[in-house]
Regions:
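N-terminal cap/leader regions of alpha/beta-hydrolase-fold enzymes
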Residues: 1-238
Length: 238
């Protein structure tokens, strides 16, 4: 097993069998030193399972979670790991435009199922996603058997609000007030629709932009990121 940068966690790549029979996809597995804990699926941004996503997984492993980060672009190209240069942004949007959302949620369900079967997992599993993964976290709450879902600056949630009536788990959404990918009108629509459901919380961070929780990112906003993290951890521990 590979040691990552944290002495208190271990990590390696594993394979997950897709339930539609189309093959296997990779996932980054990070475990706490104890090897035991609740499960957490990290749903990627549009840049693939890159260094940022793996670092987030390692961080939550340090917090005591067994974490899986599935390669959700595998049906287009396995192993996508992009940076944040203009060229990488262009490639990322191409993958995003070619992404099948329904199959992505199916892959997340397969990841949840796999995670529950990993030795040391308590059986409780959450989904936490960013950007593209933020919407997938919301859809996971609507369509999968996850125990809690947390979405950071999800894109397009306002177009899937009818599915909210199917949510049976805890859901927390973190919205960046300055996010051009989720403008004010969309934010209001989300708050109005989801605000009437118990156990569904929508938080708007007025001074934050898209990707405000990505450390070292252009739009990283520490006060908002810390507050969102505290709320996320609280929801995961309920």
């Amino acid at each position: 097993m590979k040691k990552n940068n944290s002495p208190s966690t271990t990590s390696r790549m594993i394979k997950i069998e897709a339930s539609d029979g189309r093959g296997k996809f990779s996932a980054y597995l990070a475990k706490p030193a104890s090897g035991k804990g609740p499960g957490l699926v990290i749903a990627q941004e549009i840049f693939g399972v890159n260094v940022s996503m793996r670092q987030i997984a390692d961080y939550y492993a340090e917090e005591g979670y067994i974490v899986l980060v599935p390669d959700l672009f595998w049906r287009q190209k396995p192993g996508v790991q992009l940076g944040y240069t203009p060229e990488d942004w262009q490639k990322a949007f191409e993958f995003y435009q070619g992404f099948d959302e329904d199959l992505g949620v199916q892959d997340i369900q397969d990841t949840i199922t796999t995670l529950r079967e990993i030795k040391g997992c308590t059986g409780d599993v959450g989904v936490l996603g960013f950007c593209l993964g933020g919407k997938l976290a919301y859809l996971s709450a609507c369509r999968t058997d996850v125990d809690v879902a947390i979405g950071y600056y999800g894109v397009g949630i306002e177009n899937a609000l009818k599915e909210a009536e199917d949510i049976e788990c805890r859901l927390v959404l973190h919205i960046a007030g300055l996010d051009k990918y989720c403008p004010h009108e969309a934010q209001e629509k989300i708050k109005k629709r989801l605000g009437k459901y118990e156990g569904l919380d929508v938080y708007v961070y007025p001074d934050a932009d898209h990707a405000f929780a990505r450390p070292n990112g252009e739009h990283y906003h520490k006060p908002s990121a810390l507050m969102a993290h505290q709320r996320s951890i609280a929801a995961l521990r309920e």
